[in-house]
C-alpha cells in the first residue's frame, strides 16, 4: 500500500510541474519582459519561450532558471541580507520597464524585500518576520502585516509600471491570491488597522505598531490600473491530479474538498477520523497547510510533525479500544466474582497507511520532502511528546516511518496527504 501512495505522490509532483502548467496560461498579448518570484520562479521562467528580458528572484537552495535570465537570490523562511539585495535588483528592473509579466509563487515574502521607508528599516522587517513565522498565525494574517511594512508588497510593485499581467502559482488558501508572496502585484483589501490588530495579538511589537499609526504612513494599494491576473494552479490542482493518478493505478479516490488548515493536532485527528472510515481499495486524498507553532530548535516540519501526532492519536485510539473490548461480564446472577469474567477477543482494527508530503520537496528544516508510515507501528509516547515540545519531530518520525528525500521539486502548492486502510 505504501508503494502505491509513493507512486501517487511522485507522479503528482511531476504532473504539476510549474513549467508545464504556465505554458497553458500564456497568451500572445502578454508582456515579453518577465519577473518571476518565489520558490517556483526558476521553473516558471523555464516554461516561457518568447521573452525579451527576465529577472528570476528565488530563495537560496531552490531551482534556478535554465533559460537566459538575470538571477537574484534571497532567503527563506528568514529574511536575509540577500533578500534586500534581491529587492533592490527587482525595483531597478521594474522601474526601467513599462509593461511586465509577473510570475508569482510562494516563498516570495521572505526571498525578496524592501522596507517601506522612512517608517521601517531592514531590522524592523527581519525581526517582525521572525516573530510572525514563529507565532502560529495563519498565512493570511502573517502576510497582512508583511504587506504594510514593505515597499514592494500589497500591490506596490505593480503600481510602479503602466501595465502588468500576473500569473499566480498559489500556495495559499483557495481564492486568496493576494496572499501569495504577500501580493506584490495585486490590489490589497487589508488595512493598517488590520495589521495593528494582528501585531497586538502576538505582542512585543509596540514600536512597529506606533509607526503604523503614523498618519503619513501609507496604506497598501487598493486599485491598480491596467492590471490583470489569473491562477495557474493551487492546492486543488494538486489534489485533483493525485485523485486522477490514484484512479489510474486501480484505487478509488476519496477526495477531501476543503483544505486542511486547522491547528496541527486538530488536523491529525481529522485525517485519522476520515481514514478510519475508508474501505479497502480506497485512498483518502487531502491537501492544505495546518498551522504549526515553532517551539524550539529541533528539526522537523509540518508533514513530519503531522505524522507523529497522527501516530500518537492512533496509538491512543487503539489503547482505548483494547481496554473497552478486553473484558465482558456475563449476564448471570450477581453472585459471580470478577474472576468469573470472561475475556473477549479484541476486534482487529484496520491498519492505516499514510504518506504526508510537501509539494516543494522541503518540509521545514527537516531536510526531507515527505514521510510514509503505517500508523499501527509502536511509538514511545513519552519520547515523542518530549521531542514535540522542542519541534524535533524528525527524530521521532525516523523511528516510526520512512522519510522520503527528493531534490527541491520546483513545485509549491502546499501539502498533499494520502491515506489508505488494510
What do the PLM-derived regions correspond to, one by one?
Residues 47-54, 68-70, 115-127, 159-162, ...:
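A glycine- and small-aliphatic-rich helix-loop capping segment at beta-alpha/alpha-beta transitions
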Residues 133, 137-199, 203-204:
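A glycine/threonine-rich phosphate-anchoring loop and its flanking beta-alpha core
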Residues 308-315, 350-422:
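Internal helix-turn-beta structural module
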Residues 161, 187-267:
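Accessory alpha-helical/coil subdomains and C-terminal extensions
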Residues 315-350:
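Intrinsic disorder/low-complexity segments
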Residues 59-96, 145-146:
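Glycine-rich oxoanion-binding loops at beta->alpha junctions
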Amino acid at each position: 500500500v505504501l508503494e502505491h501512495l509513493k507512486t501517487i505522490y511522485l507522479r503528482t509532483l511531476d504532473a504539476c510541474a510549474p513549467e508545464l502548467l504556465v505554458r497553458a496560461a500564456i497568451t500572445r498579448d502578454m508582456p515579453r519582459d518577465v519577473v518571476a518570484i518565489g520558490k517556483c520562479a526558476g521553473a516558471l521562467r523555464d516554461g516561457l519561450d518568447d521573452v525579451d528580458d527576465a529577472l528570476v528572484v528565488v530563495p537560496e537552495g531552490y531551482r534556478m532558471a535554465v533559460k537566459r535570465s538575470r538571477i537574484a537570490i534571497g532567503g527563506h523562511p528568514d529574511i536575509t541580507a540577500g533578500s534586500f539585495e534581491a529587492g533592490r535588483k527587482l525595483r531597478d528592473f521594474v522601474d526601467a520597464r513599462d509593461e511586465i509579466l509577473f510570475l508569482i509563487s510562494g516563498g516570495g515574502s521572505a526571498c525578496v524585500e524592501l522596507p517601506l521607508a522612512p517608517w521601517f528599516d531592514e531590522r524592523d522587517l527581519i525581526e517582525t518576520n521572525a516573530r510572525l513565522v514563529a507565532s502560529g498565525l495563519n498565512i493570511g494574517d502573517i502576510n497582512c502585516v508583511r504587506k504594510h511594512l514593505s515597499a514592494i508588497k500589497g500591490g506596490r510593485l505593480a503600481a510602479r509600471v503602466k501595465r502588468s499581467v500576473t500569473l499566480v502559482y498559489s500556495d495559499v488558501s483557495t481564492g486568496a491570491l493576494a496572499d501569495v508572496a504577500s501580493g506584490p502585484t495585486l490590489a490589497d483589501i487589508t488595512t493598517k488597522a488590520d495589521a495593528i490588530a494582528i501585531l497586538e495579538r502576538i505582542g512585543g511589537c509596540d514600536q512597529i505598531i506606533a509607526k503604523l499609526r503614523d498618519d503619513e504612513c501609507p496604506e497598501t494599494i487598493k486599485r491598480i490600473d491596467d492590471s490583470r491576473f489569473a491562477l495557474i494552479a493551487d492546492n486543488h490542482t494538486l489534489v485533483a491530479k493525485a485523485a486522477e493518478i490514484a484512479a489510474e493505478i486501480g484505487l478509488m479516490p476519496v477526495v477531501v474538498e476543503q483544505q486542511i488548515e486547522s491547528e496541527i493536532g486538530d488536523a491529525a485527528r481529522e485525517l485519522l477520523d476520515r481514514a478510519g472510515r475508508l474501505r479497502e481499495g480506497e485512498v483518502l486524498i487531502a491537501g492544505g497547510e495546518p498551522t504549526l507553532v515553532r517551539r524550539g530548535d529541533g528539526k522537523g516540519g509540518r508533514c513530519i510533525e503531522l505524522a507523529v501526532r497522527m501516530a500518537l492519536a492512533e496509538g491512543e485510539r487503539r489503547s482505548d479500544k483494547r481496554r473497552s473490548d478486553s473484558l465482558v461480564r456475563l449476564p448471570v446472577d450477581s453472585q459471580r466474582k470478577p474472576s468469573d469474567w470472561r475475556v473477549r477477543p479484541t476486534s482487529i482494527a484496520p491498519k492505516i497507511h499514510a504518506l504526508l508530503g510537501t509539494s516543494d520537496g522541503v518540509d521545514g528544516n527537516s531536510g526531507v520532502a515527505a514521510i510514509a508510515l503505517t500508523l499501527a507501528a509502536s511509538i514511545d509516547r513519552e519520547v515523542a511528546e518530549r521531542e514535540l515540545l522542542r519541534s524535533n519531530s524528525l527524530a521521532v518520525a525516523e523511528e516510526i516511518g520512512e522519510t522520503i528525500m527528493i531534490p527541491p521539486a520546483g513545485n509549491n502548492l502546499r501539502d498533499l496527504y494520502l491515506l489508505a486502510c488494510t
